[in-house]
Amino acid sequence: KERLLETHLFLKKKRCGKIKGRTVAGGNKQRGYIDKHDASSPTVSTQALLLTCIVEAHEGRDVMTVDIPNAFIQTRVEDPQHRVLVKIKGYLAELLLEIAPEVYGDYVYVDKKGIPVIIAECWNAIYGTMIAGLLYYVKFCGTLDRLGFVANPYEACVHNRIAAEKQQTVCFHVDDLKSSGEEVANDQLVKEL
């Protein structure tokens, strides 16, 4: 019961008028049994980021930034020890039941206050859990590896490859990426990701 994480749904109206929803798990409960040093994802250092900016300006590189959409939820949690149980309740539970009654119907119960509740084991990384960032980091580094990038030996979140006969550099912080090189190489990277 102590490892059961509450979920929270946050809605935000974007400038374009669309409503963006984000469901997160309350990973703060995990602090009692997961050490943050065992679960933290590396991030690009300020010095490395600034150094790449200097190189980009000096070489006249094309620079782009990309946000990888839905990064965590696309990351499979292979180790059962890292999977979490989440409690989905209220409107979100009702919505899931309405969308897919054949999937969730057997797993919904009503609590003492009359609120529908679903307990689910997550086989994919969930935003808000302590281990999600690290699992995504490992997956993303594997993707960069397959695309021919080589990790910088001094900076875990800076990777390089030769593309369009010139060096291409990526720096990243979890699911936010900065790439520099030839424009054609940056365009190709977007397609590859």
Predicted features along the sequence, with ranges:
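Long, low-complexity, charge-biased intrinsically disordered regions
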Residues: 1-193
